[in-house]
């Protein structure tokens, strides 16, 4: 009896001495070993159960069994004779109820629901106040940008910071010059919409009483001067960089 073997191999495995050995191993029978006889871990002779309950099962008398049967028979009869009416307690199916009263109650309910929806929408409008503002890329506002001051350049050199790092100007509510933080935020949004602040995006932190204006460090002095002038800020604003803290003030 001959066996035909088709062997597929990779080009890197084209050694003529190894291919016959691989083919021989492929057609060899798998080694088998006899299974050992199963021996249970508990003593078992076939006539007794290995595990027994500690207590005997409860015994039900014939009288108790008859009582249970009678109870089940009565409950089944009641279930079959009961007619389920889905219109019970529904106002529309009560013949003594006038149609006008139903219409009035339905209208009152609609008015109540519409009032609740109006209140919810007003609350939603209050909470959906604008919190972020992002400027679009523009080359016009970068023409007036001057080189960084020597003081800021020295700080960047000492901290090994690149001029394209993002920094943050912090506007506190205490320097708004008799203006509210919302007034400053409205003016800032108008400035950003007109692309007067290069590479800037801003957010208002109402719970902190602050406005954060993010920009590249290479434009930070230009952005800071424009913020102080256009927003009429009276105090000092700080330039914050992540992991480095305040690196410059104006």
Curated annotation (Swiss-Prot):
GO cellular component, one term: nucleoplasm
Sufficient for interaction with MAD2L2 as annotated region, ranges: 28-83
Record's keyword terms, sorted: Chromosome, DNA damage, DNA repair
Residue ranges, annotated region (Disordered): 108-129
CDD domains, per database record: RBD_SHLD3_N
Compositionally biased tracts (Polar residues): 108-119
GO biological process: DNA repair; negative regulation of double-strand break repair via homologous recombination; positive regulation of double-strand break repair via nonhomologous end joining; positive regulation of isotype switching; somatic diversification of immunoglobulins involved in immune response; telomere maintenance in response to DNA damage
Primary location recorded for the protein, binned into one broad class: nucleus
Cell location: Chromosome
Task performed by this protein: Component of the shieldin complex, which plays an important role in repair of DNA double-stranded breaks (DSBs). During G1 and S phase of the cell cycle, the complex functions downstream of TP53BP1 to promote non-homologous end joining (NHEJ) and suppress DNA end resection. Mediates various NHEJ-dependent processes including immunoglobulin class-switch recombination, and fusion of unprotected telomeres.
Subunit structure: Component of the shieldin complex, consisting of SHLD1, SHLD2, SHLD3 and MAD2L2/REV7. Within the complex, SHLD2 forms a scaffold which interacts with a SHLD3-MAD2L2 subcomplex via its N-terminus, and with SHLD1 via its C-terminus. Interacts with ASTE1.
Note: In BRCA1-deficient cells, function of the shieldin complex is necessary for sensitivity to the PARP inhibitor olaparib.
Name by which UniProt lists this protein: Shieldin complex subunit 3
UniProt source species: Homo sapiens
Gene designation: SHLD3
